[in-house]
Regions:
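Conserved alpha-helical scaffold segments that buttress catalytic/binding sites
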Residues: 2-272
């Protein structure tokens, strides 16, 4: 591991949250570099104040532990199984996982560990492909695999996908909230009353906000939209990840992901 997430000062035995780096970068289809995401997010989180005026909480008081990175090998399926087992142990011990990717495929491990009723994902892409370029464990299949576990998926900010993906998104177990509608979106009863997994793919943001990601897509969300969505879902979530940050910008994407992770913890701890 390169560094510890700033403010993650708790020991594992007393922690309420566990940061886990998952630097998988196996199926990136345009700009690689997601392997640097965990290191970059940790580094860029160092600029933020401990105190959160929205909740009145200090990050260092919220019992966050940093497990370090779980490094992948060439066996992606085996890696996801190992990561799932680790996250399951954290959940069983009462700690909320905070996964930093890595490509979006790592969400598959998180969802399998958390066994949610609802998968809420901020993403530019539908990620509903059964496989991509012959790979069934591609970053473009994250929501498809989430629906093998969850009863419902809500994709905030999606604006692109294949024809087959849009057809799949038309079924009743998928809700797509267009970027222009996200500022007015509120978590439905399924999120408020069930087990929810929250995933934030940084490419949900407009490229002007977060250019350091594998597959940019214009006309995306403002950083404030993402912040408000994360805070709205956090009290109802059992696990969180932020994914697809790479090293191909001046830090905008990593800084955004770090801020959103912190916002999740503040709101989950105080309102959850």
């Amino acid at each position: 591991m390169t560094g510890v997430f700033p403010g993650a000062t708790a020991g594992r035995d007393v922690a309420s949250y566990t940061v886990v780096g998952a630097p998988l970068d196996a199926s990136t289809t345009f700009q690689p570099g997601a392997r640097f995401g965990p290191r970059r997010v940790r580094h860029l989180a160092a600029t933020y104040d401990d105190y959160d005026h929205h909740t009145g909480a200090g990050f260092t008081d919220l019992a966050v532990y940093d497990h370090g990175d779980v490094h992948p090998d060439s066996d992606v399926d085996g890696y996801l199984s190992f990561l799932r087992a680790l996250l399951s142990e954290e959940l069983d011990d009462g700690r909320t996982p905070l996964v930093i990717g890595g490509e979006h495929t790592v969400s598959v491990a998180g969802v399998r560990a958390a066994d949610p009723d609802v998968f809420v994902c901020c993403d530019a892409h539908l990620d509903l492909r059964e496989s991509h370029r012959g790979n069934p464990l591609s970053h473009a299949t994250a929501t498809y695999h989430a629906l093998e576990v969850a009863d419902r998926a809500i994709v905030l900010g999606a604006r692109t996908g294949s024809e087959a993906e849009w057809e799949r998104a038309g079924r009743e177990d998928v809700t797509v909230v267009a970027p222009r509608a996200v500022p007015d979106w509120e978590p439905p009863a399924a999120v408020r009353d069930g087990r929810t997994y929250l995933s934030v793919d940084v490419d949900a943001a407009d490229p002007s906000v977060a250019p350091g990601t594998g597959t940019m897509e214009p006309f995306g969300l403002a950083s404030r939209d993402l912040h408000d969505a994360v805070r709205a879902v956090a009290p109802h979530a059992v696990a969180f990840d932020t994914v697809e940050v790479n090293d191909r910008d001046d830090g905008q994407s990593g800084a955004l992901a770090a801020k959103l992770l912190r916002a999740f913890v503040y709101e989950h701890a105080v309102s959850g």
